[in-house]
Amino acid sequence: MADPQHVQEEAAGAEAVHAHAARHDGAVVMEILSRSLQSMPASPDVSAYFSGASSRRPSAADEVDDEEALRWAALERLPSFDRLRTGLMRADADSSGVGVGAVGRGRRWYAHREVDVRTLELAQRQAFVERVFHVAEEDNERFLKKLRARIDRAGIQMPTVEVRFRNVNVQAECHVGTRALPTLANVSRDVGESLLGLVGLNFAKRKALHILKDVSGIVRPSRMTLLLGPPSSGKTTLLLALAGKLDPTLETSGEVTYNGYGLDEFVPQKTAAYISQHDVHAGEMTVKETLDFSAKCQGVGQRYELLKELAKKERQLGIYPDPEVDLFMKATSVEGSTLQTDYILRILGLDMCADVIVGDELRRGISGGQKKRLTTAEMLVGPTKVLFMDEISTGLDSSTTFQIIRCIQQIVHMGEATVLVSLLQPAPEIFELFDDVMLLSEGQIVYQGPREHVLEFFERCGFRCPERKGVADFLQEVTSKKDQEQYWIQSEKPYRYVSVPEFVAKFKKFHMGKSLKKQLSVPFNKGKIHKSALVFSKQSVSTLELLKTSCSKEWLLMKRNSFVYIFKTVQGILVALIASTVFLRTQLNTRDEDDGQIYIGALIFVMITNMFSGFADLSLTLARLPVFYKHRDFLFYRPWTFALPNVLVRIPSSLFESIIWVAITYYTMGFAPEASRFFKHLLVVFMLQQMAAGLFRVTAGLCRTVVVTNTAGSLAVLIMFVLGGFILPKDAIPKWWVWAYWCSPLTYAYIAFSSNEMHSPRWMDKFVPDGKRLGVAVLENSGVFTNKEWYWIATGALLGFTILFNVLFSLSLMYLNPVGKPQSILPEETDSQENIQEGKNKAHIKQIITVETPEPVSPNSIITLDKVIQQLRGYSANTSDRSHSYINAAGRTAPGRGMVLPFEPLYMSFNEINYYVDMPLEMKSQGVTADKLQLLSGISGAFRPGVLTALMGVSGAGKTTLMDVLSGRKTGGYIEGEIYISGYPKNQATFARISGYCEQNDIHSPQITVRESLLFSAFLRLPKEVNDQEKKIFVDEVMELVELTGLKDAIVGLPGVNGLSTEQRKRLTIAVELVANPSIIFMDEPTSGLDARAAAIVMRTVRNTVNTGRTVVCTIHQPSIDIFEAFDELLLLKRGGQVIYSGPLGTNSHKVVEYFEAIPGVPKIEENRNPATWMLDVSSAASEVRLEIDFAEYYRSSTMHQRTKALVKELSNPPPGSDDLYFPSQYSQSTFNQFKLCLWKQWWTYWRSPDYNLVRIFFALFTALMLGTIFWRVGHKMESSKDLLVIIGSMYAAVLFVGFENSVTVQPVVAVERTVFYRERAAGMYSAIPYALAQVVVEIPYVFVETVIYTLIVYPMMSFQWTPAKFFWFFYVSFFTFLYFTYYGMMNVSVSPNLQVASILGAAFYTLFNLFSGFFIPRPKIPKWWVWYYWLCPVAWTVYGLIVSQYGDVEDFITVPGQSDQQVRPFIKDYFGYDPDFMGVVAAVLAGFTVFFAFTYAYSIRTLNFQQR
C-alpha cells in the first residue's frame, strides 16, 4: 500500500506541473520532472513494461528500469506542449551524467535522463547518432523498423502520395544547325525577327523538338522506382514535369496529379522536391551549415502533427515508446533542433566532412562526390516525402552509391515515401534495391512496372540480357539502334531493328501495360488519403524565423568573405589618404569663388569615390544568385527575406567604412570645422554608400549575367554622373533631358554635400564684389540650389532612392528567372542527308587508301584511322592482342591494332610517394596539433605500355590526388618520393609533351564548337611532321570513336547553362586529350556522369588507345562488370591514401577475388556479383573494424607487394642503349604558330559572344546618342571659361565612361578563359605569351568598330570642328583610350584571384584615375608631391590629348570670372597646364599605356597561378 506521505507529495508534484502549464522554459520543465521523480513511487504495471514481467529477484537493472518507468510517468504528467519537447536520453554507466548504470551478468544496463530536445548540445547529438546509427545502412534499417513499429502499434495511418501522369507531351521550338550558334550575326537576326514578330511578321525558321511524347504512368508510395534511359531520352524533363518545375516557355499538355489533385490545387514545391544533377551551393559554407540552413527553411512539415496524434493514441492505449525512437521523433519534429541534420549527415556518409567548406572553382572544399551527396542531403533534411532525384550518383563509387540508395530505400519502405530516381550506371546490386523500373527512350516510356517483369517483357520482344551483364546496362542499350542487335535471341528469324514506337506498342499489349492502363482509367479516391499528405500553404516556417535564419546566413557569408571587405576597407583608407594629401587643407583657401570651385571639386571626388565603392556589390550579388534561384524555386523563403538581410547585414561594414573615410578626409581636406557639419557630411557619405549598394544590387537582379550586369552598371553610373549637375549645370541641360537630372541620385548627393559645406559661417560671412555671400555665389556658379533646406531634402531623397532600389531588387528576385537554360542543338541535315555525307567521308578515306596502297578495301569493312595512317605512313606495331567482351558490346568490330601516329611507348614507375598539405584551420580548431595532413602514404607502383590500369578506392581515398601528383598537376602541398619515366627521373617540361590528362571537371572554352575544340588541341599538340590534312582526318576519326560526329558543330557552352550535356562534355574532354596522340594518358573518372552505353563507348575508345601500345591510367568510381574487366591491372587505395591491392585483375577478375577471399573473415563473392563493388564492400572501413584487420598492413606483408616493389625497381633503371626524353623545344609548335592558333580560337570565341561584343557596341551606341543629345552642339557655345569647362567635361565623360565600361565587361570574359588557360597550359599546349598576345590582338578590331561608331555619332552631334586633323586626333585618342581601358581590365583579372577582388581593385583605380585626370583639380593646383602621379595617370593623358587636339590652336576670346578676357590657347595653358605643341608626345604615351597594360597582363598570366590543386 502506498505511503500517504508519498501520495500527498505526488499530488503536490502534479499540481506544480499543472501550475506551470503555460511556461515553456526547458529548465522549469526539468525542475518539475526532477521533483516528480523524487517523490513518485514505482508503478507496478509501468515497471513491468520496462523490466519485463518476471518473478526473479530485483537486480540493478530492474532498479534502472523502475527509474525509467518513473520518468515516463512523470513525462506523461507534463502539459502536451512540454511533453512533446522533452525526451529521455540514455546515459552510460560510467558517465558523469545524471543517469545511473549497472553491470550484471556480462551486460551493461543504462539509465535515461530527461532532456529538452530543442537544446540538445553538440556532444549529445553526436553521441546519440554514433550510438544509434553506428553502421549507417544496417542500424538505419533497424531503427526505422522500430520507428515504424511504434506508429503501427498506435494504429496511425501514414500520409502517402501517389503521383499519376496521363498523356504528358513536352516540346520546344528551337533553331537547328549552325543557325543555333550564338554568333553576332545570328543574335542580330534573332533580335530583328523578334521585333518583326511583334508586328505579326514571322520569318524565324525553327524546328519542333519533341522531348516527351504522350507519356503516362504511376509513381507509387512505398516503392522505389528507378528511371532509366539513354542520354537525351527526356529523363530530366520528365522529373521536372512531375515536380511541377518545367520551364514555362516549353509547350506542354497532359495531366499530372498527386492523390488526384492537379498541380494547381496544392503547392507542389512544398509537397515534392526535385534534386538536380547540378550541384549549386554556397562555396563559403560548410556542409553542416548548408544542411542546417536547408532544414530551418523547410521546417518540420507535418512531423509535429503526426507526433501529437501519436502521443495522444499512445496515452490512450497506455503504451510507452522506445526512448531512442521517441527522442529522435521529438527532436526532428520541433523547429530549432539539428538532430535531423546529424542523422542525414550520417546515413549519407557526410559526417566526416561536416565541418569542411563546400568550396568552388578557386576555393578548395569537399570532393565532387561529396557535393553530389550534399545536393541530395539538402532536400532529405526537410519533411518532403515525394522526391524526384536526377542522377544523384554521379562521381560516387558504387559502394557509396549502394549505401545511399539502400538508406533511401529504407526511408521509402518504412516511411511510405514516393521516390523516382534516375541513375546512369546502376550496378546490379543497386538495381536490385528498386521495386519498379521506368524505361524512357526517345521521349517515350518503353516499360513501366515491377523490376521482376522487365526481362520477361524484352524476351517476348526477342531480346535477352546475357550473363555477366547488368540488367540496367542491358535496358539502356536494348533500344539503341547501334547496340540492339547483339541481344537478339530469335535465331529462327532474321534480326531487324525494333524501334522505340514498336516497343511502346508491344508494352501496351503486355500484361503490365494493360494493368497500368486499367489503373489509370480508375479515378483516384481522394477520400482515402491522409489530410496532411499534400501541402496547401506556401509558408511552412514563420516569416520572423526565416528572416532570422537568412540574417544568420548572410552574416556567416560576410565573415567567410571577410577578405573582400577588409580589402575594400584598406583600399578605401588608401584612397582617403591620397585624396587628403591632394586636397590638403594647408594648400586650400576660402578667399574667392575659384577657391570655392576647388572645394566643390573635392566634394565631387568624395561623392564619386563613395559611389564607386558600391561597384563590388555587382559581382557579390551575381555570385549569390544561382543558389538563391534554387532556394526560391524550392520555396525555402520569400525573395524579400533574402534581400532584406542582404541590406541589413552590410550596414555595419558600410557605416564603419563611412566613419573611417570621413575621419581621414574631413578635417585633413579642410572642410567646415563645425561638429554638426562633420556629422551631416558623414550622414550623406553613409546614405550615398547605401544608395550605391542598392543600385548595383538591383542592376545585378535585373540583368543576371555578368557582362550585361557590368554594362548596365556602367550605364547607370554614366547617366547619374553626366546628369548629376556637376559636369553639366542644370541650366545647361537640354530640356528633353531635365527629367533625368531630377532622377539622378547623384544630383541630391551633390546638393547635400555642397549645401552642407557652403552654408558654413566661413563661406557665408564673406562677400563677393557684387554683394552676394561667397557661399551663395559658389553654389550659384556650381548650379546648386542656395536654400539651406535643400540639404535635408537631398538627404531624404537619397534615403528614398535606397529604399526604392532595394524594393526593386526584391521584385526582380521575385519575378525574374535565371538567364540561360540547357539547350539542345539539332543537326540541320535529315537522316538521309547525314548518310549521304557519311558516305562521302568514307569515300574520301577510301580514295586516300587506294592511292597509297595496292590492297583493295572491302566496301563492308570498318574503316578506322588506325588503318588509314598505317597505310599512309607504312608504320605498324605488333603487340599482343587481348579480347574483351565489351569492345564488341555495341555490335561493332574492334578497330585494327596499330599505332595511329608514330610515338614512343613509355612506362612510368614511382616509389614511396607521400603527399602532405598544410593542416586545415578547421581541424586545428578542433584540437589537432600536427602541422601537416598526409593524403598519400608510401605508394609504389608502375604503369606500362599496352596495359590499362584502374585506380580505384572509395570517395576520399586519394585517387585524384595521386594522379595529380604523378602528372605534375599539383600547385601546392609537399611531395616526397621518386617518379621515373622509362627509367629516367621525370622532367615535367618534357613529360607534358608526351602525356595527356582528362580532368574530372570538364573545362572547355564555352564559345567554340566540338570540332573546333579538337582541332585546336590537335594542331597545337601534334608534331610539326604531321601535316594539316592528317590532323583533320585524325580529329574526325577521334570524334567518330567517341561518338561526337553528330555534335561536331554544337557549341560547347557552360555546364548547366547551355550547350553540351554532362556526358557529351565528358566525351569531349577525353577526345581533346586523345587527339594529342600522347604516350601516357591519365583519366580522372572518365565514365563519371555517363550512362552505361556512353561509358561503354568511352571505354571502347580507351581500350583501343591502350591496344596501340599507350600507357593509360583511369580512376573509376562505379564500373559495371564489363567496364571493370576491360582493365588489365588494378591499384586499389583506402582512405588515407594507402595501397591495399596492386596487381593484375585476371580473367573474370579472378586474381582480385582470390586475393581478398584469402584474407581471413572475408566472405566469398556471390554468383554474378560485380567484383568491383564486392571488392570495395569487403575492403571498406566497416569491414576493417569488423574483421579487426588493416588491409594496408596486410598488403605490405604480402608477396604481391614484394612483386610490385621488384617491378618498380626494375623499371626505375633505363634499358641499355636508351636515351632520356628530349625535345628541341618545349612546345610542339613554334611561338608564332601557337599565337596563330590561339588567335583563331579567340576569334571564334569573340564572334560567338554576343552578350559581350554586341552589348558593348550597344553601350557605345547608346552612350554616343545620349551624350550627343545632352551636349547637343556644345562646341558652338564658347563664350566664357564656364562654357569651355562644360565642353571639356563633355569630352571627358564621353571617352571615360566607354573606357570604364570596356574595362568592366572584359573581366568576366577573361576570367572564364583563364580557367581554360590553366588546363591547356598544364597540358603543354602553348606558353602564356602567345595566349595572352592572342587575347590582346583579338580585342583590336572590336574596339576599332566601337570607336568608329562612337566618334561618328559624338563628333558631329557635339559640333566639334570638322577638320581632318582634329577628327583624326579625336578618333586616335578615343581608340587608344578604349583599348588601354580594355587591357587594364584584363590586367586586373590577371593579378586577382577572382572577379570580386578584380572589381574592387578596378573601382579603386577608377577613382584615382578620376582624381588625377586634371579635370576635377587642374595640374597647376595639384600639390607638388602628387604631380608625379598625374604624369602616370593614363586618363590625364587622354584629357590632355582631347583638349589640346580640339582647342590648342583656338585664338578666340572668352570671359573669365574675376579676370580680363583671355584667348582660349593661353587660358588652357595657364588653367590646365597644357602645352598645345605637346600632342605628339601625348599620342606616343597613350600608345605606350596600351602596350604597358597588355604586357602586364601577359606577364601576370604567365607568372601568377590562382588555381589551387
Curated annotation (Swiss-Prot):
Binding, ATP 2: 953-960
Cited Gene3D superfamilies: P-loop containing nucleotide triphosphate hydrolases
Subcellular location, principal: membrane
Record domain ABC transporter: where: 196-467, 908-1160
Alphabetical list of Pfam families matching this protein: ABC2_membrane, ABC2_membrane_7, ABC_tran, ABC_trans_N, PDR_assoc
GO cellular component, one term: plasma membrane
Keywords, alphabetical: ATP-binding, Membrane, Nucleotide-binding, Repeat, Transmembrane, Transmembrane helix, Transport
GO molecular function, one term: ABC-type transporter activity
Family recorded in the similarity comment: Belongs to the ABC transporter superfamily. ABCG family. PDR (TC 3.A.1.205) subfamily.
Protein name: ABC transporter G family member 38
Organism field: Oryza sativa subsp. japonica
